[in-house]
Amino acid sequence: PPAIGDEGQAIGTYQHADYMINKQIHKSNVYAGIEYDNLMDVWPYKYEKADYKEIAQEIANGKIVGWFQGKSESGNRALGNRSILADPRNPDIKDIINHTIKMREDFRPFAPAVLEEHYKEYFDTRLPSPYMSRICKVKSDKVPGITHVDNTARIQTVNKKFNKKFYNIINEFYKITGIPMLLNTSFNCREPIVESPKHAINTFKRTELDILVINDKVIIK
């Protein structure tokens, strides 16, 4: 489940009761936040149309990206709509993000978002983990940026059906680097995960994020 906690218990209890009483089955949808229209119309910033190949190349070159797409996620995990994305091959990327963007403790790890068809090549687990709820051993030394000190990672597996845009940006990075994953952490700086375009832009401005992608628009510092 995407919301592991009291809020998830409440939602699950409601769905169970609805099924028992009305035989109503609710389809899972982790992206249950607000849909924002005309996102950039009120912002006097220069922006370009998003090109996934170019964004993936920038990540491969060491840039760190704020990634804002559609509706926000339910629960406390960033699952590809309110994320900070970076190159998992960089052994220093954890320190860079912790010290210049997240402003948090050094010991806290970062998660990989990996293409579902490739997760078994890099992680010792038999089951996919679409909600970033599974911790497993890392089998490769090619991705130190997402490997914790005990050689584990809390993985998110991504397929096209789950989140097409997120899948596509990871896939473009894979085509460039041969690594089918990105470092994925929540889009925030010592506060709740960003919800609105205004919140995303303010966080972008006051941190060392290099690029901000809001749906199909790109802002570069």
Model-assigned labels for residue ranges:
Residues 1-221:
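Flexible beta->alpha loop and helix N-cap segments adjacent to enzyme active/binding sites
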